[in-house]
Amino acid sequence: MKISLKLFLGTVLVFWNVENFFDYRTESTLSGKNWTAGRFYSKARGVGKVLLELAEEKGEAPMVVGLAEIDSPKTLKAIVYSDVLSAFGYRFVHYESHDPRGIDCALLYRNCRVVTSRAIPLTFEGKVVPSRDLLYVEFDSLAVVVCHLPSKRGGSELAGKRRERAMPMLDSIAGTCSKRLIVMGDFNEERREGETLTHLCEVEPKKGTGSIKYQGRWEMIDRCMSTDTSGIRLEVAVLEALSERDKRFGGYKPLRTYSGPRYLGGLSDHYPIVMEF
């Protein structure tokens, strides 16, 4: 696939939760699921093909790609060095987090220089939360935070409090950042009515848009916030290659990698979100 030559003067960023993307050698994490080398490299190449398709559509390969549910640098290398993506020269930033399952946030980047980066653990009542750390990466003219906040599934009151605590942490980071800050990630809940922060504003997607489908309902839990939302356009990349027919609720839904122990061969239960400005 060749990148089109149409004029493009903006910046493209992507965030994608790639659903439990573990190195196939991490046997203890995916025991019983037959997560083989073939399936691992097929998924890595599939992620690369999606980024290539977005590059073709936008006329420019994404400058920054935030990823959630990545387990190690080996997984990131499999993505950026795959035959479909290697020509773009992506590099990556990754830190081991405090998540008990070993899944972290990561960031791919190209054609830009990292000034500084760090992992910022979530804290609650003075203690580090056993969850994914916030990933802060600063470039010459832009700063990015990639996040994957505690899950809401199961109705855990503690998880809800931890998730709520993350919002002022993100706002505090924004308040001390001298550059335009983009926060992208899986917030594990939709924006709450009346939710306001001092330094960050929500980038609104099109109405009726969702990045996941849960019990037949579309939810926009993969979100973007910024210290300056002017000119930022946000869309969900609903690609045919990422979808399957929803036999239970009708319509379509993301084609995930596994449903329980059953291998489906998809890439994720989330669609990527794309930001342009």
What are these model-predicted stretches?
Residues 2-83, 87, 93-99, 103, ...:
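N-terminal, active-site-proximal structural segment of metallo-dependent hydrolase catalytic domains
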